[in-house]
UniProtKB/Swiss-Prot annotation:
Protein name per its UniProtKB record: Ribosomal RNA small subunit methyltransferase H
Origin species: Herpetosiphon aurantiacus (strain ATCC 23779 / DSM 785 / 114-95)
Main localization category: cytoplasm
Summary of the function given for this chain in its UniProt record: Specifically methylates the N4 position of cytidine in position 1402 (C1402) of 16S rRNA.
Pfam families assigned: Methyltransf_5
EC number: 2.1.1.199
Length: 337
């Protein structure tokens, strides 16, 4: 049974965007349009929204939900990492706010055929866009044991990754691993069925989902695209659900808000910014006495992540790991690298 999708941190996210009546906004992760409908309500009657999602099923549901807003809502099929080109296709050069709600939605988790959850026995898929790319079953059939262990460790932060990878490789030599229940059982047997609130397969499923959809790569590209699209004073609000995502967002906002600390007295020094003195991908060459010309692009508005209130957690337990970080575009024309 598919649960009703309740958008997490709804009030906090809309407040973070600082909505205004004539603004232009992007929801890079449209989903079932919970946040999008709030953006349109808060920016009415002339505010516009470009809503992006890669899941055809979510798009169908969102189109129905946003139909009352007419031409104020433009819905496109794509990945938010492509938002710069998608915005340009619709004549948008700058926007007043961008929302990214990273990760898998409740309906995706609750539909067995999508293969995201170990709660059901279903095909091992995990693709956000089920019409493109390799499934999780394809991935674990192709990777060697070391690569599989590294993937589970890096993306799932699973300390028993080598044991799990070894068990998967042993099983696939006998028969293909094609279902969620089959994989969950293998992981549980590999780690010894350790007791606890979290299912033993949780981290492995997370790791495979992230890899199948290149979620961290999309996040990095999406943050860069979003920063460049924001008009001065525009807001970027990003909701994450696990430490890997949150770390990327935190570091991106921090780096884009930081002054360059390259001292003028040094002639050659590695520089993290794409300044005019940059002569290669890894270093800037400075004449003596010249500073890096990088100008910060963002101001971080949330020094600590915003989390769900006790009231929201009671209504929506899946919001327990959600974190919202917010930044504002500085009044400068210098674009982020």
């Amino acid at each position: 049974m598919v649960s009703m999708h309740i958008p997490v941190l709804y009030d906090a996210a809309l407040a973070a965007l600082n909505l205004r009546p004539d603004g232009r906004y992007i929801d890079g992760t449209l989903g079932w349009a919970g946040h999008s409908s709030g953006i349109l309500e808060g920016s009415g009657p002339t505010g516009r929204l470009l809503a992006i999602d890669q899941d055809p099923m979510a798009l169908a549901a969102a189109r129905e939900r946003l139909a009352p807003y007419g031409e104020r809502a433009t819905i496109v099929h794509g990945n938010y990492r492509q938002m710069a080109s998608l915005a340009a296709q619709h004549g948008w050069q700058q926007v007043d706010g961008i929302l990214l709600d990273i990760g898998v939605s409740s309906p995706q988790l609750d539909l067995p055929e999508r293969g995201f959850s170990f709660q059901y026995d279903a095909p091992l898929d995990m693709r956000m866009n089920p019409t493109r790319g390799e499934s999780a079953a394809d991935l674990i059939a192709q990777l060697d044991e070391t690569s599989l262990a590294n993937l589970i460790y890096e993306y799932g932060e699973e300390r028993l990754s080598r044991r799990i990878a070894r068990r998967i490789v042993e099983q696939r030599s006998k028969s293909p691993i094609t279902s969620t229940a089959q994989l969950a059982s293998l992981v549980k047997s590999a780690v010894g069925g350790q007791a606890g609130k979290t299912h033993p397969a949780t981290r492995t499923f997370q790791a495979l989902r992230i890899a199948v959809n290149d979620e961290l790569g999309a996040l990095r590209e999406g943050l860069a695209a979003a920063t460049n699209l924001l008009a001065p004073g525009g807001r970027l609000a990003v909701i994450t659900f696990h430490s890997l995502e949150d770390r990327i967002v935190k570091e991106w906002m921090r780096d884009q808000a930081s002054e360059c600390l390259i001292p003028a007295k040094l002639e050659i020094l590695a520089c993290p910014h794409n300044c005019a003195a940059n002569t290669g991908p890894r270093s800037c060459i400075y004449p003596v006495g010249r500073d890096c010309d990088y100008v910060p692009t963002l101001e971080v508005l949330s020094r600590k992540p915003i989390e769900a209130t006790p009231e929201e957690l009671k209504a929506n337990p899946r919001a327990r790991s959600a974190k919202l970080r917010v930044a504002e575009r500085r009044l400068t024309k210098t674009l982020a690298s």
